Each structure stands twice: as structure tokens, then as C-alpha cells.
Amino acid sequence: MPEEGLHWMPTPDVLTDDEVIRLVTIAVTRLGARSIRFTGGEPLLRKSLEDIISATSSLTASDGSHPSIALTTNGLGLDKRMHALVQAGLDRINISLDSLHPQTYFSLSRRDRLDSVLAGIDAAIASGISPIKINTVIMPGINENEIVPLAKFCLSRGLQLRFIEQMPIGAGRNWDKKEMITAEDIIGALSKEISLTASSQPRGHAPAELWKASYDDFHGHIGVIAAVTKPFCAGCDRTRLTADGAVRNCLFANEEVSLRDLMRHGATDDDLVAAWRLNAWDKKRGHGINQTDFIQPTRTMSAIGG
């Protein structure tokens, strides 16, 4: 979080609940979406999130299945809503946690709320939901010394930790590929104290490379998302819908289509399907981070959704 904060999206620009549900319905019943993830920004800021999840869980795809529903959150206030989210139909959850040290957490988030995040993690564990994944971005000179402590914290609680290479989006001038902590660096640091074996689980379209991990009597899995050094673009099947109704075919895309504007100008469901499909078909072969002509997206991560 920049010291000066981020620009808040004006409320009239944000999709209404009915608009969100309409587009999610189209994605599931017309476009073949089988997994829906609510992310952000911070999805828990939406007081009606449980209602949207409930409506999503009631949808039926053409093959008779219901969509899998996941949530990515910073965990603030999660302890008070976890039960209701599960009751609404939430299947899986990812919680962002970049540090176990209060001062480091504060410097990264500009909030003295680490205890609230940990309470949210405890609430997720108590709810019985599985899997619970912890998302951690490792940054040089900030939290690279917490790679092993975070891994032990998660393994001892039955959580699946996912380390993520810092990407050139929302990082601005602080991102330098030559200085970034790579997936190889992370695996090297882990291997000094934790036993790692490549997982035999099929990766499919998942972004993380999985490792079986163990230390003392604790066993589990650790994932590493090497979006910069080992791009997985060829296996990516995601489409992103922003809070203000723009559809994007890549996290790093600079092109997007406003389904919100189409809806508010009377578009039919068929019109929306056609626009969404066209955007998906325009997906590039790769994100291009490692190309000399790469252009960093103008939207921050909080305005796109991870």
C-alpha cells in the first residue's frame, strides 16, 4: 500500500449487486465458467457479498453442475463473517499474509491490524472449509527473512502457503526484475530447513507449482507462483471482471471491454456474451513481462483483482 493510499473507485462506477449477478450468471450458464473467485481490492468491503455468493452457488451450468466458489481476502473482519460466507456457499478461501511481524505488516499495509488477520485465519480453520491458502508476496529487503517462518506457521496449522513472485503491477518504481526474489530463491531458502519434494498432483490450469513439504511432525503442501521467471500463460484459462465492470483477458492486459457500459445502455445477454467472447479470443500468447516492449498496466492490482 503506498504511503499516500490509493484512489477509491467512485460508487456510481461500481457494478450493482444485480449487475454482478447478471454477469456471473452469463459466465456460468452461457460461457462455461466452472469456478468463480471473488477478489479485489477487498471483497469483504461489500456488505452484500454473502448475497452475491448465495446467488452464485444456486446457478446451474449446462452440464448440471454448480460453480465452485472461492474468495481472496486480506482477512480484515473475516472472523466476523466466515460462518455466513460458508453458509452462503463459499467453497475455498485465500488469505493474504505477507508478514508475521506487526511492524512489517504495518509498513506493508498501512494498518496495525495483524491480529485481525490472524483471527480471520483462525475463523477459517474453525469453519472446516478446505483448502485454506495463504498468499504471500516476497519482497527484497522487506520480508525475505520470513520465508521459512511463514512456511512453518502454515504447515503447523494445516494451511497451504503459496509464495508469489512480485510482479510489475501496482509496484511502480519499486519493482526491478534484477532484484526480485525468484521462485528459485524461495525454494532454496525453504530447502535449508524444510523437506521438499515435487508434488505428483496434476497442476492443470493452476498457477502454482506444488511441493510436498514437511518439518518435524508437520506435513502439507507449499505452492510457488513463478509468474515472472516461469510464466504459465499457456495453461491460463482465466477471465477477469473488475469491480467497475471491465472484462480483461490477462492480469497484465492494457485492453479491456466495459460490460457495465454495455449493460447500462441496454445490451441484451447475447450482446454481453459476444463482447465477452471477443475479449477472450483476443488473449495474447503471453503476458510479455520479459519483453523489452512490455508496458506496465495502468490499473493497480486493487482495481483489477488477482
Give the residues covered by each predicted segment:
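Canonical Radical SAM [4Fe-4S] cluster-binding loop centered on the CxxxCxxC motif
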Residues: 1-17
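Short, solvent-exposed loop/turn segments at secondary-structure boundaries
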Residues: 10-13, 106-110, 173-177, 263
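Conserved G/P- and acidic residue-centered "switch" motifs that form tight phosphate/ATP-binding loops
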Residues: 42
